[in-house]
């Protein structure tokens, strides 16, 4: 299985995990100028932008640790573009950035992993 196919499998697992937790699916693999949003979900009235990370094991750090400051900035930018396409912004709607880290068979959901102020 190539890396793209494996990513799709883990994103689907993450989607199911979050849906079981009560979030509603909106979109997956949204590519925008400057970045990609793995999952866009809703938690009641809150837009939730989810970065899905997978690591086979934690020998080189867990999956959550791989969401660097640079990656956060790219996610913030992509989400801002996505919201703007819908006539919204971080100032006009509630949103948050979550990380769903999969390390081996362990799922770690980190709501509000970083702030919109970046």
Swiss-Prot record:
Q: Which Pfam families match?
A: UPF0102
Matching entries from SUPFAM superfamilies are given as: Restriction endonuclease-like
Q: Which GO terms describe its molecular function?
A: nucleic acid binding
Q: Which family does it belong to?
A: Belongs to the UPF0102 family.
Question: Per its record, how is this protein called by name?
Answer: UPF0102 protein PC1_0307
Q: What is the lineage of its organism?
A: Bacteria, Pseudomonadati, Pseudomonadota, Gammaproteobacteria, Enterobacterales
